[in-house]
Design a protein with these regions (language model features):
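Histidine-acidic metal/acid-base catalytic patches
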Residues: 2-35, 41-57, 184-201, 205-291
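Active-site acidic/histidine proton-transfer and metal-coordination neighborhood
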Residues: 11-13, 20, 89, 103-198, ...
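Short linear sequence motifs
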Residues: 32, 54, 72-75, 144, ...
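Hydrophobic faces of well-ordered beta-strands that scaffold small-molecule active sites
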Residues: 32-37, 64-66, 93-98, 131-133, ...
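Acidic-and-aromatic substrate-binding clefts and catalytic sites of carbohydrate-active enzymes
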Residues: 41-47, 67-78, 101-113, 136-145, ...
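Short N-terminal amphipathic alpha-helix/helix-capping patch enriched in small hydrophobics
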Residues: 48-52, 66, 82
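Acidic (Asp/Glu)-rich catalytic clusters
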Residues: 53-58, 75-94, 115-127, 152-160, ...
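Conserved acetyl-CoA-binding loop of GNAT-fold acetyltransferases
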Residues: 61
């Protein structure tokens, strides 16, 4: 039974969010963090970030995941202005993508460079919980010793700042092997400290590489604190489509969310049957049916 304090606290939270929450969600709340990777609607964001963010909020999203956080601005807006835009629409950005390469590692000091420290510090300032490396550059894939040291050093610095470093996969981490014969994903999971590097599993790319996400949940439980949710089309090209419109068993995958450690479910869309905004709206609606 709820005590009075808890009831009043919950009521206050609901009231504050009321302009952005549908009646259905109030009656049937989904206690999960469901967000949108803004790469999915990047052209709309470039044209009119204000109107686009308003549209995203009206769809029912509560979290967004920007990209290019290391570039100093987000969609032409300073961090203060972008943060206010989100707040005005009942949105938060608990995670963001921010590129990091071997050039950001100082081997002599076994540390990250000042630019990377500044990015992490900005993340902490603006409430980022997860700073996510979105990609490993081609030239860095044969330097796994260096990349592990980079992520470890960045993870240590981020932890002190109150931010969690994470890595986002594509297909190649599951297909490409490092010089010692291990897959790149195995290097990252086996050679880094879980306290210093979390993982954001892109379910589409894992399935595209003909791997089963459940196998990786079982082998490395608790490492997958975020996921990108997009489906594999039932076509010869196997392009990405909205969650629920392809061949991936998301219901089966999400039943093991606790084992995986998933805290944030992030919708992403890279191919469009209709428009980007219509696509991410459909993807969210479909995603809610997978729990």
């Amino acid at each position: 039974m709820l005590n009075r304090r808890t009831f009043l606290k919950n009521a206050a939270v609901t009231a504050a969010a009321a302009p952005f929450i549908s009646t259905e969600e109030i009656l049937n709340p989904v206690p999960r963090h469901i967000g949108l990777q803004l790469w999915s609607i990047r052209e709309d964001m470039k044209k009119d970030p204000k109107a686009t963010i308003e549209a995203v909020a009206k769809m029912g999203y509560r979290e967004v995941e920007p990209f290019g956080f290391n570039e100093g601005k987000l969609f032409g807006l300073g961090y203060d202005e972008f943060s206010k835009l989100l707040k005005d629409n009942g949105l938060t950005m608990p995670s963001t993508h921010s590129m990091m390469t071997s050039k950001n590692y100082d081997a002599g000091k076994n540390d990250i460079d000042d630019d990377t420290k500044k990015v992490i510090d900005n993340g902490a300032k603006y409430g980022i919980k997860y700073l996510i490396v979105p990609y490993m550059a081609d030239e860095d894939r044969q330097k796994m010793d260096t990349m592990v040291k980079l992520y470890s050093a960045a993870g240590k610095y981020a932890k002190k700042a109150g931010v969690r470093l994470a890595y986002h996969n594509h297909e190649f981490e599951y297909a490409t092997k490092a010089p010692d014969g291990r897959r790149i994903i195995e290097w990252l999971l086996q050679e880094t400290d879980p306290a210093e590097l979390a993982m954001q599993m892109d379910i589409y790319w894992v399935a595209f590489a003909n791997h089963n996400p459940l196998d990786w949940f079982r082998l490395y439980p608790g490492r997958w604190e975020l996921c990108h949710a997009k489906d594999v089309a039932k076509t010869e090209k196997r392009e990405s489509v909205e969650v629920g419109d392809g061949s991936v068993d998301f219901k089966g995958i999400f039943k093991k969310s606790a084992q995986a450690g998933i805290k944030h479910y992030v919708v992403e869309l890279e191919n469009y049957v209709t428009t980007p905004l219509e696509g991410v709206k459909r993807a969210r609606t479909n995603l809610l049916k997978m729990f």
